[in-house]
Each structure stands twice: as structure tokens, then as C-alpha cells.
Amino acid sequence: MEHKLATAEKKLLVDLVKLVQKRGLEGENGGWKEFLNVYDKKLGSSLSDPARRSNDVLVAFLLTFKKKEDLQLIARVMQCGANRELIEKFKQETPDKETPEQRLVRLTITHDDYPGNYTFPSYAEDWYVTELGKKKSKVIKSTRMLSIDCEMVTCEDGSQALVRVGAVDRDLKVVLDKFVKPDKPVIDYKTDITGVTAEDLERATLSVADIQKKLRRFLSVGTILVGHGLHNDLQVLRIDHARVIDTSYVFEFVDAPKTQRPSLNNLCKSVLGQEVRMDGAAHNCVHDAAAAMKLVLAAVEKGAATLIQPTEEMMVAEKRRQEARQEAGKAQLFLHKIPHDVPSEELHGVLSGNFTLVVKPPKTGGYSTAVVDFSSPEEANEAFENVEGDVAKDKSGLPQKKAVLKLSSGLAVSLFVRKMVQDDSPCEISTSERARAEENNVSSKRQKTEDETEETKEATVNQREADKTKLFLHKIPHDVPSQELHGVLNGDFTLDVKPPKRKGGYYNAVVDFNSPEEANEAFENVEGDVVKDKTGLPQKMVVFKLSSGSGVSLYVRKMVHDDSPGEISTTKRARTEESNMSSKRQKTEDESEETKEANAKQREADKTKLLLHKIPLNVPSQELKVVITGQFTLEVMPPKRKGRYYNAVVTFNSPEEANKAFEKVKGEAVKEKGGLAQKMVAFKLSSGSGACLYVRKMVQDESEETKEANANHCEDDHLKEMEELKEKLKAMEFAISCEGHSKEIEELKQKLNAKEHQIQAQDKIIANLKMKLEKKQSKSRS
């Protein structure tokens, strides 16, 4: 493990540390921040972002974990990272070097739907992550294949459970055919589809973990897993295997959209000339696994085409499938944008009536979804009507409502309830109709932009009035429990939490009050200075304590501009931005005397200032006054991007006071990349923890500027002299090429060589100086 961690990429190590933080795991020296306080006495936990720490620090922390379950988690994450890296290499492999089997693997992993469907929550304890192997050349040449298929039932909590597994090898020999005992009560055996009955499961004794163990011996390094819609099987098996062939991705109908995938039965009819089963017959997972393997062998060994021309019979069968799906859709509703931390049993409070719920878990901590099945279309429509809220359309034109669900914990979350078919049509809209609807929507949006109607203006006003009752919490660290956010604001409100867009990032929350007055009062009661975000909306930075005792910061922002200045219209804002761009362009093209004068004044003003930057967010602004001596004012600036730092400008009465304060800062002055002098400062907070930041001048010292200008001028002179010598040499060679004056040419060449050696020597001196400077900077940081 130590060697694997030491040779791992930085991104993988950072992901590991963030995952450990998210799960609240602790090694021998405690959690991440406790470890930093022990390991790094100087900076401690003030620099807690793993991405800003060296690989050595990250590895040292991960090696403090000794528990078996923690080591297994680290091993799974490491293996997932290694597999992903190898898959990326597979994508870059040139087709002329690959085997026929690898070609089908490449067609699968480069399919548009592969990233979404084959990203699994495989960090969980009950998942098995296979090892692809270290050597790409060995893996890519392996032609060993195993085809699998699974049958699933619906459990009481809405989840899908594995009940039967079939597997065949490349020779079509059955290597596994077992029933699996579900670990939850079953409410729908789907016998007409799966062929599985309650009696079959009474005799079952194997668990999913047992099936994983039985499959492991077939999943040696380089093995290709085959299946039709294989991601569904891997999801219930809880196996993450990277080298796969999905026949629903490899084989396609001619002129059909990628979203329309041919059924296994139709593929076998077209490619193999035989059916897997008669229409209406139940599935048999062993037969389905064998059928998928036969399709792959036909493409690999017989060169069967992967682009299929559907027959009239197939089109009729596909139409029947679509109609059956549409009929089923009438009795269904779809719940989406469900926050990942909402328990599935709580979703029953969203809808009324009798129904079954099939929940699809989130991929990586984002939103989950659920399909709700009713006994009839009438019951589904009644349940949709009973959901409070206005009916809107999703991007496909399907009716949906935004619902607010109050959890047993007292928190309120929002999600969407959507119909599966259109209201005004007996069936789901076709692909072509949907495309036309989307085209009309785009055209309509364009028309609204060009010519805003009175209705649009009225809707905008209504939305603005609604937004006056809301506040927006953003830049909330992902490890802050949502229930702790109630301590940020006072008053009666509901909290709608939005999960982070990316793994380990920040999340947001919308706070809804009963009236604009209550929202304004809550905002006023938040301690801190009011600043503007980049759109001009008022916001405050809040530092508050969690129940664990640690402190975090976030931002509280209004949803609309204050009424006094009035909200800026889109047109006015566009004109302002256009005017600003034009002004900047004009300044660049032809800087006037007035601009030069303004720049000179700004420079004089900047001489009285120092910049404090890279200030950790957990450092209160009032503690910054211990860093600088003298009389000054402090202007705090919130971070410009998602991150961990903020800045502050310190203004003195004169340049002399600013220089004096900078000189009194302990530490060696170094140059940042813009050439400005700065020092790194480590200091103690009143809480006892340590923090560090940088103190930087706002302008270059006069002497340094002069030196830099002279150096640049000297370099320009050398280059100019070299160019002149080269031109003379060319002219001389051309003029006397026929006269044999080689002596003059040799003299010029010698001068040119001497000048080049002189410049090379100067370059070495400059490189040595830079190296010494970097060493000094690294010493001052450590």
C-alpha cells in the first residue's frame, strides 16, 4: 500500500483525503486537520486544502490509517483510479493496433452514454472493484470474455434487488446459474418478465457478496465482461469492472437516434437469424447471457456488421415496445432532483394514493430519482393533481411540479414530480415531435429575447416579488450538515438545500421567509459588513461555530437588488458591459494623456497601501490587525472564486508609513510573479490555532524598476546587435559569393559566435539567480 500511495497521482491522493474527510474517518493522529496540527507545527490546519499540500503530506496522512475497513476503502479508491487511467489509455489506442475484441470495448467506452451509466458508487463497502492490471499491452491483448445477465425484483423500500444470475464463457459454457436471496421484503417479483417466483427464492441461500466471490475467479486480469445493458447488471451485482462490451451500445439501427437502442431479441433476429425467446415469454438470464456472447462472437469471429438495417417486422416489434412503454408511462410518475441524503421511505410523503416506488441512487453524491407505479392512469393523474404547486414544463415538454417535502428531522427539501407522458396525447411524444417541440422552444426563447412581451415583464415582476422573500446561502463547505444552517439566520423559514455540483465542492441553500420584511430583518441581523457580489447583489460573509466546535464560513446573499437603486435591467446591463468593453479597447489602442495622468495618480495612491492575500477563510478579519503595525484602515474583499482565501487592502496615511510597516513585518522579502515585493507571515489567532498569509506591496520599488528596465534595455541592445551582425553576414555572403572573400565572412561568423556565447553565459547567470531565489522562497515558506 505504501508504494502504491507514494507513486499515485496528486489528483487521486487529493480525492482520497477529501473522501476520508467527508466520511469523518480518523487515523492514528485523528482526522485531517488534527494530523496537520501534529505533522506541520508551523502552518498546522490553517492550510487544510489537500490540493495545496504536497504528495508527501497527503501520503503521510493516508498511511496513518490502520483499520482493516479503512485500508479496504483506500484500496478500492486506488483501484478505481488505476482502472480509469487505463480506460483513458484504451480510448487513445489507434484502431489498427487493436484486436477485434478490443475494438468492441472501445465502441462501448466511447459511447455518449458510457460515462453516465458506468459511473458507480463503488467506494461503498459492499462493492467489489476488479483489477484491470498494470500493463496496458497485456490487458489489451487479452481475449478472455465472460457474459452475464441478472434478474431483479422490486423491494418494499423501492430499491431493485438481485434474485438470479447467469454467466457463460466464450465457449458458451454455463459457469454460473444461481438464485439470490434478497435482503429486503419483496413487493413485486415481476414474474411475467423475470420468470422468478416466490417459491424459487424460498430455496435461495446465497447473498450478493456470495455471488461476487463466485464471479471473482472468472474476472482475472484483462477479462472482458459482456452483456446487453450491462450497467444495470453491474449495479445490482455491486461490481465495478472497467473492461466491458455492452451490445446495446455496439449494435445500432441505421438512421435511428442513439437513444433508441435495439432489443436483445431483435438483435439476435437480425445478426444471428434466431430469437432469444418468443414474444411475451419470460426472460431466462442464462439464455440472455448466451445471446449477448453470440452477438459479440459474430462480430469478432465472423465480422458481422454492427450497424443494422431493421426489417419491417423489427420496426413493428419496436413500435409495440414503445406503445407498451407509453401505456405503462400513463400509470407512472417520475420524481427527480431528489437530494442524495433524503431517505427513500420519506418519499412516500410527497404523493397520495397507493403506489410502489423504485428508487435509483445517485451516481456520485448528487441527486437521486424514483419511478412511482400506480394501478391505473387515473390514480397517477389524481396523485399529480394533489401535489401543491404550479404546473410547468420540463425541457421535453412534459408536465411537472416542484414539491416541497418536510422530512421527519424538521428540514424541508424540494424535488420535482413529473408525468411520464403528455396530457393532451394518448401516448408519449415521438422523438421527431419532441425535436420539433424543442426547436419551437428555442425559437420562442429567441423571440422573447428580441422582443420582450408584456406577459414576460409581468412574470419577471412576479418572480422578483417572490425572490424578495428569500435569501441565498452559498459557498457552504460540503462537510457542513444541513441542519446546522439553521444557526446562521433567525426567524421562521424553510430551507431548500442544493447539493454540490461536483464531488467535494460547496453546496447552496435557498431560505424562504413568509414576507420580504422578515427576509430583510434576518439579513440585517447577520453580523458583518455588506459587500456586493459580481452581479451587484448585497451579501455578507458569516463565520459561525458548528456543534462539533469547529468554525466555518459561508455567504448570505439577497436574491434581488434593494428597491432604492432599483434592479438593473438586462438591456441596461448589456449596454453597460458593451460600453465597458469599448472603453477598455480604446484605452489599449490609444492611451491618452489623461489616462497616463490617472495611472500616475493611482500609482501614487498605491504607494500608501499594502495587500494582505491568501488569507484563510476561517481567519476573522478583526484578527488581521496583529499582522501590521501603525495607523491604517482595513478593507476586506471576499474571495473572487470558489475557494479558501480572501484578501484585504491596508491603507496608510503616507508611502513612508506603508514602507515602514512592510519593513517591520518579520521575514525575508521575495518577489511574486509580477515582480512585487512580498513576505509570508505566520501568526497565532486568539483561538490558539496558527495561520499564515502574505503581505505584499502594491507597487514596485523605484530601484527595482530601474534595474529591471536597464536589464531589459541591455537585453534588447544585445539582440539588436546580433540581428545587425546576421544581416551584415547575409549581405556579405551574397555580395562576394563569387569573389572568394571568405576571410571577411569568417570574421563576421566569429563575432556572431562570440556574441551568442556571451548571451548564453548571461542566461546561465540569470538561471542561477532564479534558482537561488526559488530556494530562498521555499525556505521561507517552510
Swiss-Prot record:
Entry keywords, A to Z: Coiled coil, Exonuclease, Hydrolase, Nuclease, Nucleus, Repeat, RNA-binding, Transcription, Transcription regulation
Single GO term (MF): exonuclease activity
Residue ranges that the Swiss-Prot or TrEMBL entry lists as coiled coil: 577-605, 709-779
EC numbers: 3.1.-.-
Domain Exonuclease: 145-296
Keyword Nucleus: yes
S-S pairs: none
Knockout consequences: No visible phenotype; due to the redundancy with other SDN ribonucleases. Simultaneous knockdown of SDN1, SDN2 and SDN3 results in elevated miRNA levels and pleiotropic developmental defects.
Keyword ATP-binding: no
Region (Disordered): 426-464, 563-605
Ranges of biased composition (kind: Basic and acidic residues): 595-605
Limits of the RRM domain: 331-410, 469-549, 608-688
InterPro entries named in the record: Exonuclease_RNaseT/DNA_pol3, Nucleotide-bd_a/b_plait_sf, RBD_domain_sf, REX1-like_exo, REXO1/3/4-like, RNaseH-like_sf, RNaseH_sf
Function, in words: 3'-5' exonuclease degrading single-stranded small RNAs.
PANTHER family named in the record: RNA EXONUCLEASE REXO1 / RECO3 FAMILY MEMBER-RELATED, SMALL RNA DEGRADING NUCLEASE 1-RELATED
Annotated protein name in UniProt: Small RNA degrading nuclease 3
Source organism: Arabidopsis thaliana
